[in-house]
């Protein structure tokens, strides 16, 4: 039976050319290009560029901040322009003048050129300042040499031969041996606490990233970011980190410590569990400042994106939205980059967020995190982390004190200290300017910025108020500057960094908030308006320039109170890195006079800014009250946020950190004068080292003898009190409370024998024998007075 297809339509016959030959175009064999190269970077060969402008995104927006530049421009009557804008305008004016004067005579041209040179800015002529120019005296010119000679004189004092007896010699030897024993004990503690570093004796350290057995996506990311060869800290730290060992890493500033811990972290996350229950927060990176945390996140994201790695980051810092961060934490990101305060806030108040699955803990700038102000928060975070984690600590001035590191529960850590004798970069030139009085400090800074240092400069100050005031001064002098300190909002802080990176502003006036970790390309000069209180802080400040093998310089204004810090800075630096800069006294005097003219303008600008802040604060209070009225139920229904400390404990911790920071600075002004008046001359002043030690030993012996006598007298007094009392003395005993008043009190009273003793000298007890007095007996005493008796009817 034939097949019957229903509802089908017969198709037309198709013409098929199958089997017929077709004419194909003839392909010519081209020769191989000898200059052809594979693009390992995927067409993206640019390096890692931080602070490009995306960091401001996601910042919690508020009211528009007060722009001080607007107030200054209204006061000056003209805008403040950056150096490159001023230079561009000057070049355009020069070219237009040349076009108009092409047909003039040579004499006129020469006259015009001379006039232009006279009327132009003196900045071009004074760009290169000779180190010997100025009216400095011989003391200023030989300042550094005199400090070096002081070290030599101290060593000579130790070797001078004085007449002393054998007893004094033995005392000196004993004191030296005690110090050696203490040093040996400390070395023994460190040997027991730390593990030996196998990379120190290994001659085959990896010279390239391919020799570290990293995954191909990560190698691709490193190549695209122009990480050609590992730095010494990376070559030693990355293999140890891949083995899961605890590390203490220390290297000079700008040596790539962030990549030293971020590369092994990403390599380990490539092999994590990707199953249904594999999502967890596995890595935590702690940073002391928000800006450093933002920078670490940028480095990690750049490596992950260029390598195509499926790794998610979460940034937990202040100034960002709490709700947005809590929503991100619900997705269980792989890497958390946080500051201690905001992390504890989420651990305490965000539901279901824990660090129980943490594998790696990294503490960047660990020496700062171990100082006062962070210790309580760090201990709380360590308690929340599992004991089996891997811990890595990194800093340019890393400490190896066992007493401080024992708080972190490290497991046989390895010290990876690259070139521990050097704390500053090789390309850094350190210049010092002597300031005879504090009144000339600000004019000297302005003279430097107007004459020599005109762009890409970071200036460090001790206080936030001083940094803000100097920004106003810079604006009045026509210098474009931005400020970076803790009184600004997070949006303002990040915007200041981006403007400085883009060249919109020439100077970044900052506190020590910006001294650690920040990597801003193009920073040519760092100026210390005043020397810091600690040598480590000075190292971090000057480390913002001369990074990654580049050249840079630091200029420090040094007063008489900073002499000790200057001596320490020169001692740790190499001789060819230290310079002495002299600013001409005429320039300083001119700036001082001009600054005196602007004194009233500065006060007016500060007053106007304060009034504007008060007005905005009043508007904010009004808006807050309206929200409380309109959304009262919703606001009070929110759970209150808690903290692991009470208000007093939190304030005490904050005050301790501030006091430690302020106390490190040398005292100046009236307080220093008072201290000098109190201690005009010490009891050891003028003595040689040997006589000083002998006198101190005699005083110690006298103190020990006095303490021994005091102890002996105490023992004798205790023995005397422990002896039983003589039999002739009345022995006290306790008697139960009787009737009357003693019964109401309910207490036992002390009495002696019932009838007293014949040897009672006070005469208060009854006497015995012939001299006993007759007792008076009241016969009516036992009768009962009126009232119903018990048996009466």
From Swiss-Prot:
A motif (DEAD box) lies at residues 364-367. Residues 94-114, 122-144, 152-184 have a biased composition (Acidic residues). GO terms for molecular function: ATP binding; ATP hydrolysis activity; RNA binding; RNA helicase activity. Residues 193-208 have a biased composition (Low complexity). Residues 671-688, 726-740, 761-771 have a biased composition (Basic and acidic residues). SMART domains: DEXDc (SM00487), HELICc (SM00490). Residues 1-208, 645-793 are annotated as: Disordered. It is found in: Nucleus, Nucleolus. Disulfide bonds: none annotated. Pfam families: DEAD, Helicase_C. Residues 427-606 form the Helicase C-terminal domain. GO terms for cellular component: nucleolus; preribosome, large subunit precursor. Residues 238-416 form the Helicase ATP-binding domain. GO terms for biological process: ribosomal large subunit assembly; rRNA processing. Its EC number is 3.6.4.13. Its main location: nucleus. The keyword ATP-binding applies. Residues 75-89, 741-752, 782-793 have a biased composition (Basic residues). The keyword Nucleotide-binding applies. It catalyses: ATP + H2O = ADP + phosphate + H(+). ATP-binding RNA helicase involved in ribosome assembly. The Q motif is unique to and characteristic of the DEAD box family of RNA helicases and controls ATP binding and hydrolysis. Associates with pre-ribosomal particles. Belongs to the DEAD box helicase family. DDX27/DRS1 subfamily. This is ATP-dependent RNA helicase DRS1. It comes from Cryptococcus neoformans var. neoformans serotype D (strain JEC21 / ATCC MYA-565) (Filobasidiella neoformans).
